Amino acid sequence: MIRNSKIIATIGDATDKVLRKIVEGAADAVLIDSYYGNNEQNVERIEKVKALREESGRDLAIIYDVDHIYAKNKYKLIRIDEENVDFACANDVDFVACPFVGNLEEITKVKELVKSHGKNIGIIVKIDCKDGYDNLDDILEIADAIMINRDELGVDISYEDLPGIQKEIVRRANEAAKVVILTTQMLYSMVYNPRPTRAEVSDVANAIFDGVDAVMLTEETAIGDYPCEALETVDRIIRTVEKNNAVDAERFEVEGYKMSISHAVSMTTKHLLEAVDVKSIVTYTKSGTTARFIARYRPNVPVLAVLPDRESARKLVITRGIVPYIEPKMLSMEEMLSNASEYSKEVGLAEVGDSILITAGQPDTGKGTVPPTDFVYISKVD
């Protein structure tokens, strides 16, 4: 069974000896953090991850956690460390995770710096302070994904308010069709123990119920005594939640306002699944935008996103429900329809006799909107 929700593992001393198991195991992405290693160590880790993912054929994403500069003698972030961004670009990571330092200009600077290097690196903005929460709508406009850092966010707001704010952030990210990652002490007891507490199991499960795209482990894998066991535990919890169909797709409906035609077609794709028994959705997409909007409605079958290159594919591996597939050739509509069955069979999403739903979008306009869908088609796998 395909696991829809994704898992991110933070790399550190504890994972160095078991990195192959991490890359070939349950992790969909890894996070490299300068807190757990210097530049020399992190370059070595990045290169090892790249070699292992190439060897295993997995499109595992690499996220680099960017440092921040503090005001002198004050616990206040004032800017993002641009040298860290340069390091991330030089090492061809897939995402950079940036703190929100009180103004959107710093995030815009990061995007411009990445562009100046000629890189297509996704921007994850960490909601790690009240300013980040207060500016959430603007952040969702410019970020590719957000990360709820409960550790630092919990310092800036009352702890009793944190659960409600967490749920609100997840909901608003879902509505904006942006990836939302939850982190901090997901299975913290497993830093020292081989089994999680019942409360931690519930925390992970409730995150999936609420609609997060990905759960991220930090100390559990970076410095813990049981990194592989922690990863396997999160995997089992998520699979059990999804197997029991415990994620309420109906709460991801959008009501009460007009939407674009392309957005409406994505929603219609979801509704077609309720009327027709299909095993998967195959969507042809240049940038991944169409696939993200379809996945935003939490369909009960996987979304096979057919993309032209691995760089684009790795941008989708942290999005819930999406399985990337590389097809570098430009296909005609007839080829799209005929090839979809073969792609689905190849990755194990459908068998002969199953029905699949096929969609295709026009090239991205570059304006941040969903490209118009050319067709929606239901086909039998032969």
PLM region spans:
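Non-catalytic helical/linker scaffolds that mediate oligomerization, partner binding
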Residues: 1-382
